[in-house]
Amino acid sequence: MKIDYLLLDVFTRTALSGNPLAVVREADGLLDDQMQRVANELNLSETVFIRRPKSERHTAAVRIFTPMRELPFAGHPTVGVAVALGLEHKTSAVRIEEQIGVITCVIERIDRRTGHARFAIPHLPLVAGKPPDKTKIALALGLEPDEIGCGMLKPTVHTAGVVYYLVPVRNAQALARIETQRGGWNEVFPLPMHAVYAYTATPEESGNDYAARMFAPDLGEDAATGSAAAALIGPLSEQCEDGMTDYVIRQGMEMGRPSRIEVQIRKDGEQLTHGAIGGDALIVGQGSLELD
């Protein structure tokens, strides 16, 4: 069996930056174990498998795998596969069946291999647990306890499909100094995935409002994490006034793969009513695997 795939860089318009993604076309013939093994072979943070949708009203169904496990939802695969489908079908919107639900993405074509996608997150963020003591967090991240927290923002645990420990730090300098090669990580951050999204406000920087880094034992550091940005809508919304607010988060700078994630928040009074994630993606290559 031969399978074809595209390679995209997501949350960027520049090749060899952003977060790389493999998109396997026509994956209906693959079993779950085969998809997991293909994702492990390609060894990117995520690989997307396009399948026939259950409903004819939808563009495609997708399965999302890391090299280690399947995910019900992830932001950079959603943006990347939406751009790939939008360019292929020459359409301005796609409806994608993911395990978390059906996601509608609005597509803007930039050129023959580049596009922009935005989607409303299928579930608004929820508190998913209690954060560790900031002294333990600081020790795990190689920081001082007084560097944990940013203004009114404190550590939280949120999910918009995937659980993250959301850890604000004092400034961009503290964010850049984080080191995770320390023992006891899973004990400090015990919830599934053991994933930490560290972030800070960046009023001194032009072009973005926040900077972030994501760490998880299975992945190491990730260049751009849409599902974490979706979870971050929870605490960020508490800083927003009534109406629509747009933020830009930079990620991946410390890895040499700069990324730009767009976040949109709407509040009606004190109630969070809408969250969206957006960004660019471009096709940088294609290939095939012989599975027999």
Language-model segments: what does each one mean?
Residues 1-73, 79-292:
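Active-site proximal loop and beta-alpha junction motif in alpha/beta enzyme cores
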